[in-house]
Regions:
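Bacterial N-terminal signal peptides that target proteins for export
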Residues: 1-9
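Short hydrophobic/aromatic segments of transmembrane alpha-helices and their interfaces
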Residues: 9-10, 86
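Alpha-helical transmembrane segments
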Residues: 11-15
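Ser/Thr/Gly/Pro-rich, low-complexity flexible regions
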Residues: 149-304
């Protein structure tokens, strides 16, 4: 993947054509004028609200006049259809890099209802520019992948109808001191529009409730945070705590109503027991009755 600003300074070819001078403002570029897409590949989330997506076009130099360009669709390399799956915002495929500036954006919008989950949609764009401004090393095209992203609504995700309904879950997990993977029922309740409290994740005998926080700010990277908190008592160590692991983020999926917690179990000032994965599927009350696979009576606390 091309990152223009980094490559401009890092690649041997760029170094040959670039003459840099040191000033109070830092390093400045004084080579030829090139204009291109800032990257070769973008992923565009398509949501059920009026969101636009920007594809930056960058120039290596500024100019004292406006620079106008057109952007065209490369049909033979595109699977998405303009007017059906996406459009240019304001129906305009023209951009202007204003005088004194280096960047302008191609603005796109997706049509959520016309895109299916299984669709593999790509838009290939070509920048129409003077030949002298095209940098052969990077070309004048880019690709935009369209990905449908369902909205995150807590009640729908948890499959509850009322705010105070019990949350029913199927949990697939293994626990410390036991290498086998098992499936259990688990339960909880909604605290607010982004927080779920798990009441029996570590077994009914555990009095500790586990708080997890959903973050949907980036629709392409739906994350869960589990703050540091006591999880259960262990006979030799006392309270064992759990927390999210930065290197292995916990996440959730709005298509299939499931979430995955990757947690470190540890005792403060003593050390870690390891990192464990817990997979949860949200089910409604009817599915819970049909499933009837018993409460999660086994957990860390079962080995105390």
């Amino acid at each position: 993947m091309k990152k223009f600003l980094n490559l401009l300074l890092a690649t041997p070819v760029a170094a040959v054509i670039m003459v840099a001078c040191q000033s109070d403002e830092g390093i400045t570029y004084s080579g030829p004028e090139y204009v291109m897409f800032s990257d070769t590949v973008y992923t565009m989330p398509v949501q059920d609200k009026e969101e636009t997506f920007s594809v930056p076009v960058a120039a290596t130099t500024t100019a004292d006049y406006d620079r106008n360009y057109a952007v065209e669709i490369v049909n033979e390399k595109s699977t998405a259809v303009r007017g059906l799956h996406f459009d240019f915002v304001d129906n305009s495929n023209n951009i202007t890099i204003k005088a004194g500036e280096r960047v302008a954006n191609v603005s796109l919008k997706g049509h959520y209802t016309n895109i299916a989950r299984e669709d593999s949609l790509v838009v290939s764009l070509r920048l129409v520019e003077p030949k002298a401004q095209e940098w052969n090393l990077y070309g004048n095209t880019t690709r935009v992948d369209l990905v449908k992203c369902p909205p995150f609504k807590m009640n729908e995700f948890l499959k509850i109808k009322k705010e105070d309904d019990k949350v029913n879950l199927i949990m697939l997990a293994s626990f410390p001191f036991d290498s086998s993977m098992g499936q259990y029922s688990a339960h909880g309740y909604k605290k607010d529009d982004h927080t779920l409290i798990l009441t029996d994740m570590f077994g009914e005998s555990s009095s500790e409730k586990i708080r997890i926080i959903f973050d949907e700010k980036d629709p392409l990277d739906l994350r869960i945070t589990v703050p540091e908190q006591a999880a259960f008592r262990e006979s030799n160590y006392g309270y064992v705590w759990v927390r999210s692991v930065e290197q292995y983020p916990s996440y959730f999926n709005t298509f299939d109503n499931f979430f995955v917690l990757i947690l470190e179990a540890y005792v403060p000032q003593i050390g870690s027991f390891g990192v464990y994965q817990y997979i949860f599927e949200c089910i409604d009350a009817d599915e819970e009755a049909d499933n009837n696979n018993g409460a999660a009576t086994r957990g860390f606390s079962s080995y105390t």
